[in-house]
A protein has these predicted regions:
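Glycine-rich loops and low-complexity Gly/Arg-rich segments
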Residues: 36-38, 60-63, 102-105, 129-133
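A structural preference for long, well-packed, hydrophobic secondary-structure segments
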Residues: 13-19, 27-28, 51, 86-91, ...
């Protein structure tokens, strides 16, 4: 194993619902021997509605505390939060780097029809997500630019 693959590593998986984050995050978890943090999974397990933003924020804070402990001891972590804002991605990168971790960003995107079809097929949302919400999300989501991607490390596993 090379030095870059044996050091602590944070993989941030970013994108809108239905973009394939969970599929990629599970793959990264297996390939890297990482711990994957997904608020959706925890909320499902705890019987919390996925639209409960206060609970989601608390879960993400707890997940980040655990992730930092893992990174500080040389572990590998996959964050599957969506990370819609550049400021959030920058903060994760900065904090992980301060712990000596390499940090990679995986940005996933898909057409609105594909996002809607995937979200509808999985049927996790209650109430169901209306199609118009996806257009609103695309407007709110800050897609990573080449400028933002530059300070991230090269992913060990390509998307």
């Amino acid at each position: 194993m090379s030095e870059s693959s044996s050091q602590a590593r944070l993989a941030i998986v970013c994108g809108l619902p239905g973009s394939g984050k969970t599929t990629l995050a599970i793959r990264l978890e297996a390939e890297y021997g990482a711990v994957r943090f997904s608020p959706d999974d925890w909320m499902d397990d705890l019987g919390i509605n996925l639209h409960d933003t206060a609970a989601r924020a608390k879960i993400e804070r707890l997940q980040w505390k655990l992730a930092q402990k893992l990174l500080a001891t040389g572990g590998k972590v996959v964050i599957e939060w969506g990370t819609w804002a550049r400021a959030e991605r920058d903060a994760l990168r900065t904090a992980a780097r301060e712990l000596g971790a390499a940090v990679e960003l995986h940005y996933l995107q898909a057409e609105e029809d594909v996002l809607f079809e995937r979200i509808s097929r999985r049927g996790r949302e209650n109430p169901p997500i209306p199609r118009k919400a996806i257009a609103e999300w695309k407007y709110l989501f800050e897609a990573p630019t080449s400028d933002e991607l530059a300070p991230f490390d090269e992913p060990l596993l390509q998307d």
